[in-house]
Amino acid sequence: INLLFGLCICLPFILIAVIIIYSRYRYKVLSRRNLKNKHIIITGGSSGIGKSLGHEAAKRGANVTLIARNEQRLVAAKTEVNASCVCSTQRIHTLSLDITNDFEEIEKAFIDLEQEMGPPYMIMNCAGNAVCGKLEDTSTEDIKKMFQLNCLGSIYATKAVVEKMKSQGFGHIVFVASEAAFVGIFGLSVYSASKFALRGFAEALNMEVRNHGVQVTVAYPPDTDTPGFAEEEKSKPQETRLISQTSGLWKPDEVAKRILNDSLAGYFTSTNGMDGFLLSTLCAGMSPSTNVAYLLLQVFLMGPFRIVSAMYQLYFQWLIKKCLIAKNKLKKSE
């Protein structure tokens, strides 16, 4: 009886361990999938995470199309990504295109691209920008630009390939959002809104395409050492900087490798580091569950993590208040 009782207690833990081990094995197999002759399209591919994704895809044998507005940067990026190719038959193509233009123009460019490079196997929506500042200090022009590029640009580019992917019965659609799509941050009100919108779009799109063999992944990278981040730093409020520093600064190659691996493994959510794991667990809600082991972790950790998140929020509010007091003191002294 004691032995039977012990087995009954241990069985759930053994089952969980088996699920986790199998999930890790499956992840390793799928994330190392060969991309030889597969066509991968990357928007925002001339710099930052987008360019690093180009390197990762090229290392795995893919034919890569880098899309961006600046032709000079595209030429330089093409040269760099070419150096990562592992096969002489690989092709690295560039397309100068503003994905915030009218959809008809984008659609035509993608039709021409398919004739040149073949059907799309994966599209990685990396184009985006952030203008930091309090809402009252953010111009309406900057608000429009952020929503057009961060949200509408990704929607338009995806719309240009989704019908083809569904008809061919396979494909991967990747959206590079931000940890700011999980939590609103001081000085990033509009940016957060645009990334939250992208997350909602991706969840709905996943329902539309999953039965057609098309997978959707949303990546939530932390602060990453890119030219875009360097530009943000120029106008970033002190409050935003202090809050952001709690997650550290990641290298674009590290972030890109994780995004591509998670996408190939069929994960809906891709994060980096402990902060990313905490946020994705807390914000899982009705998001698609594509990994049983991760689902079990969410069930057990969501409660404790909520306490941790409350402590984070108190700390953030303390930082904001501290900055406000310092500013008021400075005003009085002037």
Q: Where do the protein language model's features map onto the residues?
A:
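Conserved glycine-rich Rossmann-like NAD(P)H-binding loop of the short-chain dehydrogenase/reductase
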Residues: 60-77
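SDR active-site lid
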Residues: 207-292
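Active-site helix of classical SDR
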Residues: 158, 194
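Conserved glycine-rich cofactor-binding loop
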Residues: 39, 46-47
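Substrate-binding pocket helix/loop in short-chain dehydrogenase/reductase
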Residues: 134-135, 142-144
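Conserved NAD(P)H cofactor-binding loop of Rossmann-fold oxidoreductase domains
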Residues: 126-131
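Residue(s) in the substrate-gating loop at a strand-loop-helix junction
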Residues: 178
